[in-house]
Amino acid sequence: MAAVTGLYGSIDEFLNHCSQSGDSAYSALRSLLERLEKPDTRTEARIFLAHLQKKLDNDGASQRCLETYHFQIQDIYLDRNEGTGYQNRKKFTMMVIPSIFMPEDWSFTFYEGINRHPDSIFKDKTVAELGCGNGWISIAIAEKWLPLKVYGLDINPRAVKISWINLYLNAFDEDGQPVYDSESKTLLDRVEFYESDLLSYCRDNHIELERIVGCIPQILNPNPDAMSKLVTENASEEFLHSLSNYCALQGFVEDQFGLGLIARAVEEGIDVIKPMGIMIFNMGGRPGQGVCKRLFERRGLSVNKLWQTKILQASDTDISALVEIEKNNPHRFEFFMGLVGDRPICARTAWAFGKACGRISHALSVYSCQLRHPNEVKKIFEFLKNGFHDISNSLDLSFEDDSVADEKIPFLAYLAGVLKDGSRFPYEPPTGNKRFRDLIASFMKTYHHVPLSTDNVAIFPSRATAIENSLRLFTPRLAIVEEHLTCNLPRQWLTSLEIEQTRDSKTPIDGITVIEAPRQSDLMIELIKKLKPQVVVTGIAQFEAVTSSAFEHLLRVTREIGSRLFIDISDQFELSSLPSSIGVLKYLARTPLPSHAAIICGLLRNRVYTDLEVAFVISEEQTIFDALTRTVELLQGNTALISQYYYGCLFHELLSFQIPDRRQTAEREAENVEASDIDMIGFSSSAISVLSQSELSVRVTEKSSLLHMDVDQIFLPTPTPVKAAIFESFARQNVTETECDVTPILRQFILNTWNFSVEHSAEFIYADFPLALFNKLVLCCIEEGGSLCMPAGSNGNYAAAAKFLNANIMSIPTEAEVGFKLTAKQLSSVLETVHKPWVYISGPTINPTGLLYSNEEMKSLLTVCARYGARTIIDTSFSGIKFNSQDWDGWNLDASLAGLTGNPSFSVCLLGGLFFKIPTGGLSYGFLVLKSGFLADSFRSSFSGLNKPHNTVRYTAKKLLELGEQKGNLTGAAQGQEKLLATRLKRLKETLENCGWEVIEARGGVSVIAKPSAYLGKNIKLEKDGSTWVTKLDGTNIREAMLRATGLCINGPSWTGIPDYCRFTFALEDGDFDRALDCIVKFNQLVK
């Protein structure tokens, strides 16, 4: 009888040892494996196993071997025909032990599904099998398809050891000699087995896979505590066997169907599989085929069902966990009575039928899955696994229309990259995101052969905004606007009949009259010739859009009569790799755009978000271009960054495969100017005043490297909950209106924050930025014939916007002794001289000083406003961040307003922004609360044309407000931010004071004001690029001097409205803040 040297004297001795217990048998088999692993004892050990199998067969013990000796050796026959590879072998010799799932219908069906793939699927590929059990499928794959490597993975350490024994059993014949395949390799060259929790072994060892196959448990353990035990080699056989039957909760939405482990396997597979890799999974049909299929599709995989059959439910598997799920869930699992039943029964019925000794079955399918956008989906899941696991339950990458998937998945990948790689959103100029403008110019150059530069493209929130801003910039006496483009214009423009002004009047009057006109060019041109408007805004009819003749005719006529022309190409412009021909762009390809004309294009045609809009304007006249971009800064604040990212991603997809600069741009003909532009209408007087005198943002150029301490934006690291909310808003599909409705929780937020009760009759109005809402209030003030009263020391952007709109502004003096706060005495002295006052108050945090109004101070100001019947705008947009405020008890607006009597026209509105306290950078959300009676109905047309936050932003806002109410991670992030900003303020104050500035210490917000006392009256001389700049420093040039000398942007006295006082914001990125302090020190040294 065979023996193993140094281990067992005979087979009987080996069997006697194994018969003692399962642990004894496993110990004996592990010792045998050690002999198989050593080349010098391998042959002897393999011969011993051959003799062992023969003895068990000859003794008739093979059928009861598992009960008697706690192991079993059996042959598995797979091929019907003559096999290939291993000398026409048709069988596999396999060993099992009690703690391993026995090969049966479940795994055989899985192999049959794999078998339906073409032979090339595994050839020379790197493969992993999840839940390999005793390894027979891994070995079968290696034998039949000759892969490069198969990794058999199982969480059960005993299964891995038995798999190695089975590998040796089949890699060597009964004489202990290696069996070679057609490539002269053995199974040992192709297969390896490792203990691994799903794909952790491959992930930890940086193994990229081309194929993943898995046949893993899909029923929750009836005893959840059992699954929390540590998986060790010495664990009980019952526990180890349960790993083959049951799974634990995995934290996925699919847990409710018992599919959580499969879901985790798929997501881990996405991480390690190569882009064109394939995953094949056995799916029990108990949850229903739709649920099983959706598990894969919502993770961005296309699914092919290879094989489906029915199998009997394993008698040792307890389905009571599924019964419990059905109790609290309308979903019903699918079982069948026997193999021939064709009507499904629920888990509860199946459980009862099984208890009554009935046989129940369920469908079993084999799914082959492949990533539809592999690189992008991988990037999405790479982002999710880094602290954003909860979002994966909201992720939905299933699309019925491939074109929708082709658009949305790349954007989600891009957004994931932005959120993962960037700790914060960068500063974006009002002109628009530089990358986005580059992409638009490149698209025009590549697809339409129009040689535009980035400096010819300005970004607007929408087409309607671009049109209204253009009209406000010029304030024409008469404008003709194509009828389809007038819907968002102010109603009074469309009803005015003041068109009898003399044509010789070169100075625009305040009122704008808009005449609607048809789009057809011959009718439009006839109106232009008869009415002689100063501005024309029109599109091109579809039947005229292909050629440039209609556009050229419009150019010629408008030039002859001195009209400015804005052409809308939104309806013809296509984001496509084969865009339709557009006559306007054909003209631009051969001729520069005339100075009196500009092109407006609203991007409306995306396949995912039909209501997500952004627009761009093209002008090749620098003065007009600069002025148009300033209107965005003055009237809207900026264009929503996420919208620019979305359309930028679409442009990028259309350009990414193109070879840059492959085609030489054709030379354009010089513009044939037949008339002088002198007769053209110029900018309105208020626009000229603001553009020439107000302090606006510094233009960013290719060569400039500026530091911005002049921007009301937080550039600190974006907290994880904020990133999660932003991504989830785009990752989800079919978001309901209720999930986006901010109003209920905002009403509660306002009550909790400022003790301001907002009744249900109050109106909430939303916009992308608070500045846009402020401007609409200014227009209401103008329409009422009121005066806008603003304290000296108000936000310079708001003051400039009100001037641009030509409001009647009354400045309320403030004094240094009280930190330039507005006092009741000063307010009263102004209001007693003003008719129909509108009072603007920034609070509790005052921008720009950073001081706080106490509750008593606010009550006294509201009392004065009530006495004089002032409409009062309380702007909370810059409030939320507080420090050095231990003695500040907050506001109680309800109490302050209670009992106030006076002029009946007194009313209060609340202006605010949701994201100022939270560093969201790229997001903004403005709100305006109008209590009943604040505005007459006739004023409401002033609010037309507002750019409302997109549903994704609304969803994010609601999510963050809810998180704030829960006092969780988001609250901690906000508190940490306040501590950081308090430290920043201290450092900035010390630096400024050491350099000769007088600082008024802030108590909140992100800005502080200071007076350059040590520099006033001193000369400074700067030399750069061969030129010299010399000046005597004063309040009018201190900002320019700082910028020229150091590249640091600050706000000067003309912005703060306080003589000699400049503003510094300090919510910069860490490195930028340190460099900004260095600039302040450098400037001090230069002046000295």
From Swiss-Prot:
Enzyme type, top EC level: transferase
Protein's GO biological process: biosynthetic process; methylation
GO MF entry, a single one: pyridoxal phosphate binding
pH curve summary: Optimum pH is 7.2.
Catalysed transformations (reactions): L-methionine + S-adenosyl-L-methionine = S-methyl-L-methionine + S-adenosyl-L-homocysteine
A Pfam match: Aminotran_1_2
Designated name of the protein: Methionine S-methyltransferase
Organism: Wollastonia biflora (Beach sunflower)
